[in-house]
């Protein structure tokens, strides 16, 4: 209850400043299938361009309390910021250890029809790296375990700049449709993880086609 109240407080007080500063434009792969309203349990995945991606998601899906997987480094900045992230429902992922309790926490949330937000790249890309970075398998494992649909999102990662923030929401994916009984669990996890990454890449390509088409129409 506290997280839900705090999340709504942040969204209500932050909506206008965020809208003015970032001017987020939302596109849809198929709005009839998936809009900004999420019904039931779901896992949201996205490419990772900026530390502000987390804030953008709060306002992209305002009607749900998103429980975001966040790297341990963000919780170690200072106690106040750590409290802020936890109050918003942030789940700490310690990438330096072999503690996978975050997967169980995500599963428990999904079992209660909650929404989990994951950045499968697990870190921001460095200059010159091909994006999106390789995905970690925890998303695929959590989706298989919970049978929750995966909603892919692509963002151009532009915040507080002259260039407008733009987002493309894809259609949900049922990862069990990719499960191959002839493969081992490890092979299935690897295959599904790669296909989830391919799905985000397809969104990125579609986004770029739409942007190029607009530029050509202006020319």
Each model region followed by its residue ranges:
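Compositionally biased, charge-rich terminal segments
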Residues: 1-5, 69-72
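Helix-to-loop junction immediately C-terminal to a conserved catalytic motif
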Residues: 14-48
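Glycine-rich, highly charged phosphate/nucleotide-binding loops
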Residues: 23-27, 97-102
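Short, glycine/polar-rich helix-capping loops at beta-to-alpha or helix-loop-helix junctions
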Residues: 10, 76-81, 160-162
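Non-catalytic C-terminal accessory region of glycerolipid acyltransferases
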Residues: 2-5, 103-219
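Catalytic core of membrane glycerolipid acyltransferases/transacylases, capturing the structured
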Residues: 36-97
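Short hydrophobic helices that act as membrane-entry/anchoring signals
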Residues: 3-22, 82, 86-89
């Amino acid at each position: 209850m506290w997280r839900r109240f705090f999340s709504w407080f942040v969204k209500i007080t932050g909506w206008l400043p965020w809208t003015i500063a970032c001017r987020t434009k939302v596109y849809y792969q198929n709005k009839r299938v998936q809009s900004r309203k999420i019904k039931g349990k779901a896992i949201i995945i996205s490419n990772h361009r900026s530390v502000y991606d987390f804030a953008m998601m709060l306002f992209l899906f305002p009607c749900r309390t998103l429980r975001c997987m966040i790297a341990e480094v963000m919780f170690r900045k200072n106690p106040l910021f750590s409290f802020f992230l936890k109050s918003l429902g942030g789940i700490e992922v310690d990438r330096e250890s072999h503690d996978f309790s975050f997967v169980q926490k995500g599963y428990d949330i999904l079992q209660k029809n909650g929404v989990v937000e994951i950045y499968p790249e697990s870190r921001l890309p460095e200059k010159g790296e091909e994006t999106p970075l390789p995905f970690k398998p925890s998303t695929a494992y959590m989706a298989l375990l919970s049978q929750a649909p995966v909603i892919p999102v692509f963002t151009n990662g532009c915040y507080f700049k002259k260039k407008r923030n733009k987002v493309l929401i894809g259609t949900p994916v049922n990862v069990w449709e990719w499960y191959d009984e002839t493969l081992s669990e490890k092979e299935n996890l690897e295959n599904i993880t790669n296909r989830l990454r391919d799905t985000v890449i397809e969104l990125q390509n579609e986004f770029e086609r739409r942007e190029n088409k607009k530029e050509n129409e202006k020319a």
